[in-house]
């Protein structure tokens, strides 16, 4: 069973990554796009490493997977190779 803190960390990191990627997608300023894309990518990379080590329940995966898919799609749209 995963630790509650693990799931909360992953959930928070996903929301943070999605926020940064959404800001980048809506931005017009190149520096803002670049900065927020980089932050979203850091969140995504951290998530992949952390999720690899966490034993998430099926219920947790059902909640978190769609958010991870959305973050990956946003990063692809921003030109990231994920």
Language-model segment annotations:
Residues 1-27:
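Short terminal alpha-helical segments
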Residues 2-7, 53-66:
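Acidic, Ser/Thr-rich low-complexity linear motifs
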Residues 33-42, 60-69:
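Short, charged, amphipathic alpha-helical segments
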Residues 45-48, 52, 69, 76:
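Generic short alpha-helical segment signal, independent of protein family or function
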Residues 62-82:
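Eukaryote-biased recognition of C-terminal alpha-helical segments
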């Amino acid at each position: 069973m995963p630790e509650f803190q693990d799931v909360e960390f992953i959930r928070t990191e996903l929301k943070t990554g999605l926020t940064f990627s959404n800001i980048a997608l809506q931005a017009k300023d190149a520096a803002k796009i670049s900065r927020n894309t980089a932050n979203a990518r850091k969140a995504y990379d951290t998530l992949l490493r952390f999720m690899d080590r966490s034993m998430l329940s099926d219920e947790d995966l059902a909640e978190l997977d769609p958010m991870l898919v959305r973050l990956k799609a946003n990063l692809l749209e921003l030109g990231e190779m994920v």
